[in-house]
């Protein structure tokens, strides 16, 4: 991608707070017009990146580049980058209209221009009827919309959102996710969003940056992150995962290997390179696994085991299976399986203790080295 297609870049950026390393040698390119999410647990460095982009922090080393220009020492008010904070930071004594127009007023814009742009911003977030209200008379979701309107009214190059849904209830969070994504498409500007919620990141983003302990673990589309995790950390962080321990026993061709997994021979597919005898970890999402009744065994290789638990979740059923152990006296591996619920399918009504055969959809496995990479 050409350099001019990036609105923001971090090049070799590290950030220290006293002796604590918050970010370590970060390289990140943010594309014009994309919805990018920084995803990770508390303390991983995602908010520090946001503060570097906004200008509230400066890097200890490396460069922050905005539209091709190094902006390490450029203050926030000169970057044309706006931030929506967790607490919304609305002025309680001002009306909604005055809150949204505050930045334009500070820029000494003409009154008629302020009125027009505030009106357009409020219409964009469906609050045109609430201009005369004070923040205290608004719901949490409405306050958030005001904060967003105030941020976009200045026509920023980039809008930064720091876990803005954290104070909202579940249904309102879901609604706001759709509204924010629609708004981003409508405006056509770059949104950089911070969250620890994987579902939130996947629902809204063009690309996701998975972070851990001040480092970037993987960058990719939601589908790439979920289906092709770069390592065990990413696989575990973005959803439920089953991990089978195994050994490569032979190579059939460029992508197909024979392996022994939990004591059972299986073929596995991977683009990674392995040698005979290499220890591996095979990763399977719960929805990739298939269960078979013992009176209807599948062709090819399969595990055997027993149902331990079933959990009804409405659209799906979670099924816990204990595999038969390859070693006498040792418990077998426990697997989590997810199946779509069908009340007319008698075979999905498993009972604890029931024997089953276990397979998966060929090619959907992820094979990593024994070190989890």
Swiss-Prot record:
<comment type="function">
    <text>Part of the ABC transporter complex PotABCD involved in spermidine/putrescine import. Responsible for energy coupling to the transport system.</text>
</comment>
<dbReference type="InterPro" id="IPR013611">
    <property type="entry name" value="Transp-assoc_OB_typ2"/>
</dbReference>
<keyword id="KW-0997">Cell inner membrane</keyword>
<dbReference type="InterPro" id="IPR017871">
    <property type="entry name" value="ABC_transporter-like_CS"/>
</dbReference>
<dbReference type="GO" id="GO:0016887">
    <property type="term" value="F:ATP hydrolysis activity"/>
</dbReference>
<dbReference type="Pfam" id="PF00005">
    <property type="entry name" value="ABC_tran"/>
</dbReference>
<keyword id="KW-0067">ATP-binding</keyword>
<dbReference type="InterPro" id="IPR005893">
    <property type="entry name" value="PotA-like"/>
</dbReference>
<dbReference type="GO" id="GO:0005524">
    <property type="term" value="F:ATP binding"/>
</dbReference>
<feature type="domain" description="ABC transporter">
    <location>
        <begin position="8"/>
        <end position="238"/>
    </location>
</feature>
<dbReference type="InterPro" id="IPR017879">
    <property type="entry name" value="PotA_ATP-bd"/>
</dbReference>
<keyword id="KW-0547">Nucleotide-binding</keyword>
<keyword id="KW-0813">Transport</keyword>
<dbReference type="GO" id="GO:0043190">
    <property type="term" value="C:ATP-binding cassette (ABC) transporter complex"/>
</dbReference>
<dbReference type="InterPro" id="IPR050093">
    <property type="entry name" value="ABC_SmlMolc_Importer"/>
</dbReference>
<dbReference type="InterPro" id="IPR003439">
    <property type="entry name" value="ABC_transporter-like_ATP-bd"/>
</dbReference>
<dbReference type="InterPro" id="IPR027417">
    <property type="entry name" value="P-loop_NTPase"/>
</dbReference>
<dbReference type="Pfam" id="PF08402">
    <property type="entry name" value="TOBE_2"/>
</dbReference>
<comment type="subunit">
    <text>The complex is composed of two ATP-binding proteins (PotA), two transmembrane proteins (PotB and PotC) and a solute-binding protein (PotD).</text>
</comment>
<comment type="similarity">
    <text>Belongs to the ABC transporter superfamily. Spermidine/putrescine importer (TC 3.A.1.11.1) family.</text>
</comment>
<keyword id="KW-0472">Membrane</keyword>
<protein>
    <recommendedName>
        <fullName>Spermidine/putrescine import ATP-binding protein PotA</fullName>
        <ecNumber>7.6.2.11</ecNumber>
    </recommendedName>
</protein>
<dbReference type="InterPro" id="IPR003593">
    <property type="entry name" value="AAA+_ATPase"/>
</dbReference>
<dbReference type="GO" id="GO:0015594">
    <property type="term" value="F:ABC-type putrescine transporter activity"/>
</dbReference>
<keyword id="KW-1278">Translocase</keyword>
<keyword id="KW-1003">Cell membrane</keyword>
<dbReference type="InterPro" id="IPR008995">
    <property type="entry name" value="Mo/tungstate-bd_C_term_dom"/>
</dbReference>
<feature type="binding site">
    <location>
        <begin position="40"/>
        <end position="47"/>
    </location>
    <ligand>
        <name>ATP</name>
    </ligand>
</feature>
